[in-house]
Amino acid sequence: MSILRLLAPACALLLAASSALVGACSPGGGLGPTSQRNLFTELLGKSDAEVQAKIDSAWQQQFYGDDATQRLYYPVGDDQAYIADIGNADVRSEGMSYGLMIAVQLDKRAEFDRLWRWVKAHMYHDDGPRRGYFAWQCHFDGTHIDPGSASDGEEWFAMALLFAAHRWSATPGSIDYAAEAQAILDAMRNDDRGGEITAIFHPIEKQAVFAPTKHASRFTDPSYHLPAFYELWARWDRTEAGRRFWADCAIVSRDYFKKAAHPKTGLMSEYAHFDGRPLDGEKGDFRYDAWRVISNVALDHAWFPTDGWATEQSDRVLRFLLSQGDFIPDRYTLDGRPVSTDESVGLFAMAAVGGLAADPKLAKPFLQRLWDAPIPTGRWRYYNGLLYTLALLEAGGRFQIHAPACAR
């Protein structure tokens, strides 16, 4: 009997063990930069202390500012809290997931835990065809307005929880962040649900669907494509099938961006078909959701650069926005015709993050606009305000990959 045949059983055991460990503790290679660029320092000459002070000010106002005009974070009882969409008088999985991400990036464990407990207590579906999903829209008392899911909420929940698992040590009675994240990763791939409910990720297209229902799973939202997140899930998912799936999703989403971007303006639509074609009507325009695609492309480039396309694309869309002059409307047809007479700090914020991939000369005006903009207040402070703070973190070098200890 050959030595190879004698060693085969032992090798198989070693491979199985190493495969199981990959999901819990991926090797450090390929995990992106150990620190992210601070564009405010690079391009605006701001000191690190100035950048931190601006971020601290945004945190303080949005989490502990005036109840009526400033804050978004509202504590409930002894151990819960929610992020409020003030203008629509509701709580959304989008906002809760952004609040969690801001908290983990700023090392705010108490606020993170309060938010997550509210999510699990009020948004989570623990049975039925939606098991493992979260209601995207609730009243302030936690009752559901719409029990359905918006796919980006689950995506950002999973990523924030994984970062929390790697940043904070487990203590007796604490939230098991890693288990919560894995449950969401599993749920998003589960298409065996029955009735009208589907997987959040289309099993064949390997794209996040607009919503996991029979109708809304026939198309996607380009801003739900987060290849930088999928790259990390491909390392940290505890299942081999999951790791393979997320690796494929990262490749698909990068290719999808190339199909969905207008060749001249770089703009992408609010909703689109799986082949990148925009939906008909106003949802085929560059609108509120689509602002976020600018940052999605740039963050992926910052963490996992693959080719030169992300720079070309970021240059294209920032150049188009700058061509509008001093007043930059916040919505357009994909070929560049304005369909709005409003400006929004949320668009400037996402364009500033585009500087992680774009030519510095194109990025600098948007970084300056973001730096000079006041923290959003008033009725419509929710969406603009959260994008404002996320952009400060991403452009300011504070939006980090928090990896398992053994991968650092």
Model feature map: region roles:
Residues 297-300, 322, 335-342, 350-408:
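A cross-kingdom marker for long, charged
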Residues 106-107, 165-169, 234, 238, ...:
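Short coil/turn linking the two alpha-helices of tandem helical-hairpin repeats
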Residues 1-11:
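Bacterial N-terminal signal peptides that target proteins for export
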Residues 38-154, 160, 170, 290, ...:
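N-terminal carbohydrate-binding/catalytic regions of secreted carbohydrate-active enzymes
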Residues 9-20:
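Bacterial N-terminal signal peptides
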Residues 29-71, 89-93, 128-132, 146-152, ...:
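Extended ligand-binding clefts on enzyme/binding-domain cores
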Residues 116, 161, 178, 185, ...:
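Inward-facing hydrophobic residues that define packing positions of alpha-helical scaffold repeats
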